[in-house]
């Protein structure tokens, strides 16, 4: 393919470190593994599947329900197995929900809709599913970027490893709503509905309701131990930074 040919052409430049963000890591790895020294891919916490362990370590929980993520996860496992058998070693970094300046933050319907943020700012009701509450853990983009930098600068420790990125803790769905209530300075009522109603009428897209179904609390102890990772921003702080950015960009 043209993409593969373009990557092979780039590989001739003999870059020391190659980082893949667009989700094309397997093609990147094949193209660069004989010329680069270190290849790092960005995955997702969701690739581990529905979490049965919280905080969730860097191991398979169950098959990922998102086909694209499942395919990429299998490729990551292949690259981990192949790491060091050619010139390059391989590392994968798995962030949770990415937050902070530069991107509309996750909102209470599991998306990044500016219209939902306007509704939150106006104190409109939020609908959450009944039952035990999910843990939501947005992580600041700068903290995720820092883990990539730590992997680059600690190649031996990072070689052949999968690392979770994440905040120091997560918050419940109700607390997630309260964070926005505090930031916008309004009371945001919460109304609970059945899961049937929630998935049918509130968040019909699995990519949205999964945020309120599967815990998002990565275990970051491995990154702390091997790379010295220490996230700077809490969920409250990174959401506030993202909202400040929206105001600065006149999105709100």
Predicted regions located by residue number:
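NAD(P)H-binding glycine-rich loop region in Rossmannoid oxidoreductase-like domains
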Residues: 1-37, 41, 47-53
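Conserved C-terminal active-site "lid" loop/helix of NAD(P)H-dependent oxidoreductases
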Residues: 141, 199-230
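Conserved loop-to-helix N-cap of the C-terminal "lid" that shapes the substrate pocket in Rossmann-like
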Residues: 92, 132, 137-145, 162, ...
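Mid/C-terminal beta-alpha module of Rossmann-like enzyme folds, strongest
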Residues: 147-208, 243
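Active-site "gating" loop of Rossmann-like NAD(P)-dependent oxidoreductase/epimerase domains
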Residues: 44-70, 81-86, 103
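Substrate-positioning beta->alpha
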Residues: 107-116, 128-153, 160-161
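Amphipathic terminal alpha-helices
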Residues: 234-252
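Conserved beta-loop-beta element that borders a ligand/cofactor-binding pocket
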Residues: 80-107
């Amino acid at each position: 393919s043209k993409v593969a040919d373009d990557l092979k052409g780039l590989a001739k430049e003999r870059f020391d470190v190659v980082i893949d963000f667009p989700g094309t890591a397997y093609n990147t790895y094949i193209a660069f593994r004989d010329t680069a020294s270190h290849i790092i891919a960005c995955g997702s916490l969701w690739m581990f599947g529905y979490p049965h362990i919280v905080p969730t370590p860097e191991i398979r929980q169950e098959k990922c329900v998102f086909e694209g993520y499942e395919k990429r996860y299998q490729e990551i496992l292949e690259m981990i197995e192949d790491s060091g058998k050619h010139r390059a070693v391989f590392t994968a970094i798995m962030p949770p929900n990415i937050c902070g300046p530069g991107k509309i933050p996750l909102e209470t319907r599991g998306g990044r809709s500016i219209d939902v943020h306007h509704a939150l700012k106006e104190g409109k009701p939020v609908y959450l599913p009944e039952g035990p509450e999910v843990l939501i853990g947005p992580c600041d983009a700068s903290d995720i970027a820092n883990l990539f930098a730590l992997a680059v600068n600690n190649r031996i420790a990072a070689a052949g490893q999968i690392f979770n990125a994440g905040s120091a803790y997560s918050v419940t769905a109700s607390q997630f709503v309260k964070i926005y209530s505090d930031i916008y300075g309004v009371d945001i009522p919460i109304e609970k509905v059945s899961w049937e109603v929630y998935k049918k009428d509130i968040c019909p897209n699995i990519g949205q309701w999964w945020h309120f179904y599967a815990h998002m609390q990565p275990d970051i102890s491995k990154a702390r131990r091997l790379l010295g990772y220490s996230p700077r921003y809490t969920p409250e702080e990174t959401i506030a930074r993202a909202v400040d950015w929206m105001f600065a960009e006149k999105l709100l």
